[in-house]
């Protein structure tokens, strides 16, 4: 039943990403909070990136990314973006980079499609074999890779996401049993960097359940618990989403917001979240008061949001309806100043399959099989440029 339901609409996996944690954002608006420091990927847990759609990662002064090449193989590249061709990440002597023996190749059903993370001088991908997903660690110079631990049983619809905190990695399946009709248990697993011991730190049982949009903020792992329902006949869907957080210190998880939260960001005592179909709220943890700052409309029913110290970026995810699974609209990134005055609408193009937001330097999207960028310093007038 699960496979049949998910296969009906090719965008269902994308819908899970859209509905359950599209992107991240920071609140620096009408308050005294200062802008957070955006660090290089060497130490940053990269919470400003979209955890569940992670085909590019910052590190070592540049960016690692995956690309579907003309020969049908997915390869891992490194680039410093401007005026530089991407370098195939393989250190094998005399490698032609044309066979599966190349250490940059992540093709076929052996690896989760296009996913790559960077943390503390290593890259991490998900390696699938014999129905099990393994955490695979790759040297950042492309000199080698190894499977370090088993994570989850996986099928072709599974999509494992990773979040990093200090010396631990947290993993979950962001598709889970979304669209299924049976009760399943979804888990967040903790992996200790070093011995790579695995333990389960959170479980949720529900029909059509998935855990999505997890991010590291301070002493907590925040995440969205979704129960996704799909009507096969009418092609309508509905996602019940609630925001939770797991306390790293005491190991206790609690519900934070009991609304339809499509995305969120935490800055100190301030929580910013987007309620599907309603808009963007700013919530104060201390006073427990909130204000609606951006009203949802037909062009932005859900939103992923990022902030770079100067501007806010709201991605409408191309979602045309909260109930019609097939309804799509033009995918647009709306750029706002700190007072939420709209200053630009950036068309992502009809071939856009992902928005990554990036860091203080670049805004990234994926168009078909290519990653494109706009320099943040040119955000008011710049156009998309394809990575070489």
What name fits each language-model region?
Residues 29-48, 74-100, 131-152, 179-205, ...:
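Surface-exposed loop/turn elements that mediate protein-protein interactions on large endomembrane-trafficking
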Residues 16-27:
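Hydrophobic alpha-helical membrane-insertion segments, chiefly the h-region
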Residues 1-16:
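N-terminal Sec-pathway targeting helices
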Residues 11, 20-21, 62, 133, ...:
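Small side chains
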Residues 47-59, 99-117, 154-166, 206-218, ...:
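Repeated scaffold domains used in trafficking and secretory/extracellular systems
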Residues 54-71, 114-128, 161-180, 218-232, ...:
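Short beta-strand elements that form the blades of beta-propeller/WD-repeat-like
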Residues 2, 87, 101-224:
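Long, acidic/polar, low-complexity amphipathic helices and coiled-coil-like
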